[in-house]
Regions:
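Gly/Gly-Pro-rich "capping" loops immediately C-terminal to redox-active cysteine motifs
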Residues: 30-31, 37, 41, 53, ...
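Conserved long hydrophobic alpha-helices within structured protein cores
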Residues: 82-91, 185-196, 215
Length: 236
């Protein structure tokens, strides 16, 4: 056996040993470019869970893990909101084309997985759902619909009911931070994480019609102040 052959074998042995050097990152530890992240747990956990909750609920923003919401909102609606955000609210744009960090494919993957994991078509089978979006209705008719469907929890004027842990839904700062579509979504889908029923109401209640939903939203939107925060306290 020649010395050259022995040296070659030794070099190959050293190279093979490099594959298991101490400190070498495992496959799961290797850096992945942000635009190549595909796992739902990573995409949702890094971009959505801070507002919408680790499991799509119990976060400061509305739950996405909500069968009624996912039944009303189409894939196109979810992709548009995720991509472009909601101007004037705390929902940012995530699409790279809109200044965010996610590719169109990553956003489509997020929406597909959210629906696969959290949608429950059987929960709304046979239910006539109001459309996701619609023009504002009539505020005066909305006052009557609000009185019959909402006032028992939120108060006759929307400022809440003494002894009930529900804040004002006519607070100027709140209305300044929520869009008309945000109000509509809440009226339709409720807030299951906060104990608020959807448009069907509680047991024995009469569901709101599509027209009544639009009217209630108009009633609330009409209370949005032009300049949130006023009147300002007098300076001494």
């Amino acid at each position: 056996m020649s010395a050259r052959f022995v040296h070659a074998l030794a070099a190959l042995a050293l190279l093979a040993g490099c594959a298991s050097l101490p400190g070498k990152p495992t496959h799961d530890e290797r850096y992945v470019r942000p635009d190549r992240v595909t796992a739902f747990a990573d995409l949702y956990g890094q971009n959505c869970s801070g507002c919408h909750g680790a499991d799509g609920r119990l976060g400061p923003a509305r739950p996405i893990n909500d069968p009624v919401y996912l039944a009303v909102a189409s894939d196109a609606d979810l992709i548009r909101v995720t991509s472009q955000g909601v101007p004037g609210t705390t929902m940012p744009a995530f699409a790279i084309s809109a200044g965010g960090t996610l590719t169109d494919q990553q956003i489509a993957d997020l929406v597909r997985e959210m629906r696969a994991r959290w949608a429950k078509p059987q929960d709304v089978a046979g239910v006539t759902l109001p459309p996701y979006a619609a023009p504002l209705g009539d505020a005066q008719r909305g006052a009557a619909a609000y009185a019959s469907a909402c006032a028992s929890c939120h108060g006759a004027d929307g400022a809440g009911v003494a002894g009930k842990a529900r804040g004002s839904i006519v607070d100027g700062s709140y209305l300044a931070l929520v869009s008309d579509q945000g109000l509509r979504t809440t009226v339709i889908a409720g807030r299951s994480d906060l104990g608020m029923p959807d448009f069907r109401g509680g047991a024995g209640a009469t569901p709101l019609s599509a027209a009544q939903v639009a009217d209630v939203v108009a009633f609330l939107a009409a209370k949005r102040p032009e300049f949130p925060g006023r009147p300002y306290p007098e300076s001494k």
